[in-house]
Amino acid sequence: MNFRYNHTPFGYKRRQTREVKVGDVKIGGNNPIVIQSMINSDTTDTKGTVKQILELERTGCEIVRFTVPSQVDADNLPSIRQELKKAGSKIPLVADIHFTPSVAMKAVEYVEKVRINPGNFADKKKFAVRDYTDSEYDEELERISAIFSPLVLRCKELGVSMRIGTNHGSLSDRIMNRYGDTPQGMVESALEFIRIAESLNYYDIVVSMKASNPQVMVQAYRMLASRFNELKMDYPLHLGVTEAGDGKDGRIKSAIGIGSLLEDGLGDTIRVSLTEDPVLEIPVARLLAEKFNKRIVKPEPVRGYSEFRNPFTYERFYSSEIKVGTFEAGENHPVRVETVLPFENSNSFLANIAKLYQYGKSFSIEPESILIDSPSPDQLKEISEAAAALSIPVGILLGKNVSLNEKLQNELRGFPKVVFDPFLQFQDGKKMLSFLQERQNAGLYTEIHTSGAKIESFKGLPETLSEIGIKNVLFSIESKEILYDYRKLGSILSQHEFPILLHGSFSNPEEALYDSAIGIGGLLIDGIGDLIRIKTPKMKDIEEIFQLSYDLLQGTRLRLTKTEYISCPSCGRTLFNLQETTARIKSRTGHLKGVKIAVMGCIVNGPGEMADADFGYVGAGPGKVHLYRGKEIVMKNVPSEVADEKLVELIKKHGLWQDVINV
């Protein structure tokens, strides 16, 4: 199988694509990454729609999308256009179409771009199970071509571009029956429509592969890029994690999916989907885009590293077990969290530990491993005595100027883990190996930690350690290029079983949130990493960083320590105030560890886009809600004023309710 989907996994180079014009905005080619969003007003409300479009334009949005669900909405587009012209707005508009080809034919007259969903443009979702023969499948493609071709020809005639936007949760029954609910199904769904467009010599196409799970979303885009390479297609990519939610969780999920793909050189335009006011999406999108619009591509090629992953599926990078008392990591254990703390004295240190435990009680999380950051050697005795009062391991990170002499090595035997840089602490390789062997003989662990600039020097070390039987070793890196350098480390360690600790050092919590989501999150969804450790310089940030570590694991779906929400960003199809409803449901259910709840504004993003949610709350009509258990409707047309309570009753009925524990 061909795993090639970008220039290289070990360095940055943007994928070359054709340029597609959306009005005066150019997507792809050598143009900067374009920022876009979607309004949530009713498209028949001219005043409200124009107001939101202008607000987004002022905030820095470059393209605006709105839903056109019916002929009535399409009929109002001339009024919207007229009012925008009066206001001096030139921002390109995108009509979002589901289910209604006839509406698309009207909308195309008044917009610069049309978005169609190949899963429902010519198909109705019936969840039917059947086997298609090849001839029956071909007949279906001919039927789709007959429905889709008129829109393609009209777009071509008017100079209107198109996004073929696949959503993981709304694949057609035909695709589902042949490929399953998979990234491959998403890719093939889009390719079917692209081929129809190409048969009509239409190429002004942008493509997207959206999912609410960043792992699925990333795999689908990579697979699409790989197929594009095979088919000699060069269409620009529109990136987005759909139904990402709100607050920090929504930003983390978006950064994991969008950011890690941009690091891979994939992506020409982005939309951050938050269940918030659309204008709040723009600063997040700008932050992500600017990282790469300003990126300097290093001229030297990356050599000496080979692909060790299957980038199209999740597979945990196998490592041997780490066991210190009751602490277990590596092997098949969940990815663990290590927290960095300073040490001034025993009292303040133990108080900080107690503070973390107290904080964690409210969120069903707790400290798992502690690392003391660069203590002075004369503090080690006091640290050891304080650590003896704890049930979790306490390790030591040696400062850069500390020499690992014999006296210090003896003092470090009181700590289950020591982190050191072999290129700073040892001048003699034999002495380093002797140090590692002595610690292993005592049942202790050592973390070999160095800068990304020195990673080449790691080559050959795993083989040496394996030859002399040293196993109690972890590897980590200090780098601003977290994704690339840890992939290099993974390549070096790919034939060995040494655990990997994902380390990120950041200047403040905001930088930590976005850069750790892109770097550490991007590695986690590839199965790389047995522990994570996030570090900022200020003690006041510790609780926030502690929470962020677990939020990253939640966002990658590797450890669910709180309720997981899948909520759409709202649009003109939404049948209730989505932000208020989501906040209300969170207030009732936010303590349900590991339960997945979808809050969806309408039937378009309902059964499908709920993905793997345990329960769903989906708008069914004005003042009416459908409640789901999985993908099955269990309560229809529930009045919205009692729907929250009925949802709680449904959760209780299925045994997933827990009473709130007051801390």
UniProtKB/Swiss-Prot annotation:
GO terms for molecular function: 4 iron, 4 sulfur cluster binding; 4-hydroxy-3-methylbut-2-en-1-yl diphosphate synthase activity (ferredoxin); 4-hydroxy-3-methylbut-2-enyl-diphosphate synthase activity (flavodoxin); iron ion binding. InterPro entries: Dihydropteroate_synth-like_sf, IspG_atypical, IspG_bac-typ, NO2/SO3_Rdtase_4Fe4S_sf. Gene3D superfamilies: Dihydropteroate synthase-like, Sulfite Reductase Hemoprotein, domain 1. The keyword Electron transport does not apply. Pfam families: GcpE. GO terms for biological process: isopentenyl diphosphate biosynthetic process, methylerythritol 4-phosphate pathway; terpenoid biosynthetic process. Its EC number is 1.17.7.3. Pathway: Isoprenoid biosynthesis; isopentenyl diphosphate biosynthesis via DXP pathway; isopentenyl diphosphate from 1-deoxy-D-xylulose 5-phosphate: step 5/6. Keywords: 4Fe-4S, Iron, Iron-sulfur, Isoprene biosynthesis, Metal-binding, Oxidoreductase. Coiled coil: none annotated. Converts 2C-methyl-D-erythritol 2,4-cyclodiphosphate (ME-2,4cPP) into 1-hydroxy-2-methyl-2-(E)-butenyl 4-diphosphate. Belongs to the IspG family. This is 4-hydroxy-3-methylbut-2-en-1-yl diphosphate synthase (flavodoxin). It comes from Leptospira borgpetersenii serovar Hardjo-bovis (strain L550). The lineage of its organism: Bacteria, Pseudomonadati, Spirochaetota, Spirochaetia, Leptospirales.
